Amino acid sequence: MAKARSGAAGLGLKLFLLLPLLGEAPLGLYFSRDAYWERLYVDQPAGTPLLYVHALRDAPGEVPSFRLGQYLYGVYRTRLHENDWIHIDSGTGLLYLNQSLDHSSWEQLSIRNGGFPLLTVFLQVFLGSTAQREGECHWPGCARVYFSFINDTFPNCSSFKARDLCTPETGVSFRIRENRPPGTFYQFRMLPVQFLCPNISVKYKLLEGDGLPFRCDPDCLEVSTRWALDRELQEKYVLEAECAVAGPGANKEKVAVSFPVTVYDEDDSPPTFSGGVGTASAVVEFKRKEGTVVATLQVFDADVVPASGELVRRYTSTLLSGDSWAQQTFRVEHTPNETLVQSNNNSVRATMHNYKLVLNRSLSISESRVLQLVVLVNDSDFQGPGSGVLFLHFNVSVLPVTLNLPMAYSFPVNRRARRYAQIGKVCVENCQEFSGVSIQYKLQPSSTNCSALGVVTSTEDTSGTLYVNDTEALRRPECTELQYTVVATDRQTRRQTQASLVVTVEGTYIAEEVGCPKSCAVNKRRPECEECGGLGSPTGRCEWRQGDGKGITRNFSTCSPSTRTCPDGHCDALESRDINICPQDCLRGPIVGGHERGERQGIKAGYGICNCFPDEKKCFCEPEDSQGPLCDELCRTVITAAVLFSFIISVLLSTFCIHRYHKHAHKPPIASAEMTFCRPAQGFPISYSSSGTRRPSLDSMENQVSVDSFKIPEDPKWEFPRKNLVLGKTLGEGEFGKVVKATAFRLKGRAGYTTVAVKMLKENASQSELRDLLSEFNLLKQVNHPHVIKLYGACSQDGPLLLIVEYAKYGSLRGFLRDSRKIGPAYVSSGGSRNSSSLDHPDERVLTMGDLISFAWQISRGMQYLAEMKLVHRDLAARNILVAEGRKMKISDFGLSRDVYEEDSYVKKSKGRIPVKWMAIESLFDHIYTTQSDVWSFGVLLWEIVTLGGNPYPGIPPERLFNLLKTGHRMERPDNCSEEMYRLMLQCWKQEPDKRPVFADISKDLEKMMVKSRDYLDLAASTPSDSLLYDDGLSEEETPLVDCNSAPLPRSLPSTWIENKLYGMSDPNWPGESPVPLTRADGTSTGFPRYANDSVYANWMVSPSAAKLMDTFDS
């Protein structure tokens, strides 16, 4: 009896322990949907059926039991109201309205929703006594039912459309587990419509249902499965149904309804060997680095990839080995990949598991072993028949590595090679395949005197790169062959091997061009790239890589030390030693313009031309300036014909003019349009015809007459009434001319008075000076540019000739810059606020570097305009640039009255004078003046601007300057001058004119500098303390203006005629020819016009008849 009692007690305890399990049995049931949708209306009657929720069985015999959550929630899971409006039949899953809702119910929910109109609420439906708590709803044991509240009464039944009666507003989809008993998962009927509109008939028919595992009951319209589904056969179904709607007195309508069914997977397929292969063999030899994959085996599983959280628990892989060395050296990595397989013409998801045998540590080159490794794979959740365990076999052989070098290496090297130039590579056998092996290379020179190379080890391919380490040794004549011993050492085992190396030195050393940058990447244009060298250049010259011009591309245009190695998208061990070698691959700074950055550094792809400034740690990728040919062959033919026709017309017109000239009386000639600053030192002025031959001007054929008797033709377009002009104080004067400040009444139709400047001759001026003034008058009538001094008019009748030009408030640029130094070093940063005085008087604020660049840019724009007009200035300098209000630059000095704002600069002595320190080298030696010689002068002008009006070549007399320029000497970079600005100066001072930039390119470069300029110029720091730079007591105002002898200069004189003639200097070592390869007048023409008259506007003297004709054209 006691035993019976104790047995009964034990049974009771077991039953007590099983009670929770029995209570949880309905949890095997699951909802066929995770969300349901329905509408609720105001005054909808109580008892209205809303919808059915369905549960499917996980095992036979399970009976569903439904319950609702306690509260209604807002869409943001806000608890709004206790649920007493909607009830559910726990057995059938039917939800119905427990009470009618009115407008107050709507308002009550809206108030609890924070005053916002409420549109949607949801409640939770649970299966049985699920352990999920209120507010925690997760499929498959819980589903949400969303209700859209409509603040209106139920619509009239006749207003419904057929689709609204057939299917819910939101689509429906279903989830059914495989291998589960069949059951009902949906009911077609729209219950509220059926309840409130009984006269409307809605019937459904499942299409093509015979071949599918689904059926629809024609009476209750319930959709259920016919048999258990198998996901491995078909994973997705799309059911099609036909809905027929019929109402009283209405035609029958049919609507197609579709809804998807997804079959959920369970682990019912065992793992198998992919392709039936369960063994892999591997050899470990050159790849010995930790993480190296030794071998891979694949395992196929027809089930889907488990969730990441389940993967580690479900699939386990264990390395079975009693060898501790193997356990430490190898590990197994498991990676599942989803794949698709075909089953009954359907694509079904499956899983391919990759098991990789990986080195857990790096192996030395001396390690040698042979072993077999077994890996156990276990699918722990497998529920089907058979086994979920597999054994993978790996046969591994670890072989030792022997270091060997070739018998000997031989490379050439150019004597002009720059430092870090790559000469070649050394590499032990199979080094390209090495991984995890660390090799160090060293060079042992046979002679220390001729040791010019170094070696650096590449971390990528374990090779050694030979490079130039000492350029001085390469230049020694005795160093014709460099001999070394290459030693390769394994860092871990210290094993070594060696080979001989012979390097032959070739070529002849040529000195570097003056002003070349340290890095080839700085150069943006091909000519300056190929004439300079840079770090890493094997030939001593940079190489230009021309891009394909196809948008942002890896093949962008750039300047490189060697296109074989740079840029290649990879910053190697040698390039990383100095950023100047190949910043295109190694720069980590910002890249401006269209580009694609490399993974860690450099430019992967760029747009147009990419150039870099390593010192500033910036690169720029910008469109190429040069475009494709604008004119094809037909176009060129038409232009040639037009030019030929124009030439014939010109010849006929010239013949007619000459004939009229000899037929009629002489009239005063029209002055030259050349911007001359000093007549050629000859007995009479020389003019050049379009053919380039000399002919005497009218000065040599006419007697000298007084200025007063010189009759000037009136030009009605430009004539200004003399009585309306009131002259004021003198602004500046020379020996024969002066400029005064004046006011003009009703100038150009303006009301009131306008402040102007008036140019005029002094009483002692001759006809030659008058011709100069007339020359400037005729020239200014033809130019119109915001940065060229503007002509307003002239008083040419009934008195001396007066030219009325634009008034420049601040005088010459040189004086303006020097006065700015008196403001003092105080300045405000870009982030600070300016004081009130600088805001009221913006022209008086302290200069910034951006202002100085803006001055240079304005002048370059004006010179670009003059160059396009085929005009040569010949005296471009800061003293001849005027500063108008608003700090606007005005190019001036086109004739006699040049530099009258700088009183003592051009005071004419007994002889003419020329500005030596501003003149191009070909102008000094060959008396040749072109637009490119103006570019040279512009470079000196840049130097004046940056130094705030400093004197060029301070302390250097002109007689020394000639030899210095011939030997390549150029002014050094001022302290406050940026590298980019100084490079532009050096480009302007190129010895060959055709290698200097044109003004259009100069303007573009200055525009970019203006964009990048941000800092204010510190006048205290930027003003040099050297008194030579600004001391006028050294007569620098006179020194640069060299006297021109009045005697004729025969073209047979040597190129140093200025030195010999002016200073009586001679030197037997001076060359007899000019250092500039320019052709003289008796040879072939140069690439640029020698004077302005070689182009459109000429220094030509015309006959009176032709002058009259030109006056007619002008007016």
Swiss-Prot record:
Binding-site residues, Ca(2+) 3: 267, 269, 301, 303, 379
Pfam families on file: Cadherin, PK_Tyr_Ser-Thr, RET_CLD1, RET_CLD3, RET_CLD4, RET_CRD
Protein name per the record: Proto-oncogene tyrosine-protein kinase receptor Ret
Paired cysteines (S-S): 137-142, 157-197, 166-243
Protein's organism: Rattus norvegicus (Rat)
Region called Cadherin-like region 4 (CLD4), residue ranges: 406-507
Extracellular topology ranges: 24-637
Intracellular or extracellular location(s): Cell membrane; Endosome membrane
Site residues (Cleavage), renumbered to this chain: 708-709, 1018-1019
Gene3D superfamilies documented for this protein: Cadherins, Phosphorylase Kinase, domain 1, Transferase(Phosphotransferase) domain 1
Subunit structure: Phosphorylated form interacts with the PBT domain of DOK2, DOK4 and DOK5. The phosphorylated form interacts with PLCG1 and GRB7. Interacts (not phosphorylated) with PTK2/FAK1 (via FERM domain). Extracellular cell-membrane anchored RET cadherin fragments form complex in neurons with reduced trophic status, preferentially at the contact sites between somas. Interacts with AIP in the pituitary gland; this interaction prevents the formation of the AIP-survivin complex. Interacts (inactive) with CBLC and CD2AP; dissociates upon activation by GDNF which increases CBLC:CD2AP interaction.
Topological type in the membrane: Single-pass type I membrane protein
UniProt-annotated stretches for the region Cadherin-like region 1 (CLD1): 29-153
Top-tier EC class: transferase
GO molecular function: ATP binding; calcium ion binding; transmembrane receptor protein tyrosine kinase activity
Positions annotated as active site in the UniProt record: 875
Residues covered by the Protein kinase domain: 725-1017
Post-translational modification: Autophosphorylated on C-terminal tyrosine residues upon ligand stimulation.
Region called Cadherin-like region 3 (CLD3), residue ranges: 266-380
Function: Receptor tyrosine-protein kinase involved in numerous cellular mechanisms including cell proliferation, neuronal navigation, cell migration, and cell differentiation in response to glia cell line-derived growth family factors (GDNF, NRTN, ARTN, PSPN and GDF15). In contrast to most receptor tyrosine kinases, RET requires not only its cognate ligands but also coreceptors, for activation.
Protein encoded by which gene: Ret
Transmembrane feature ranges: 638-658
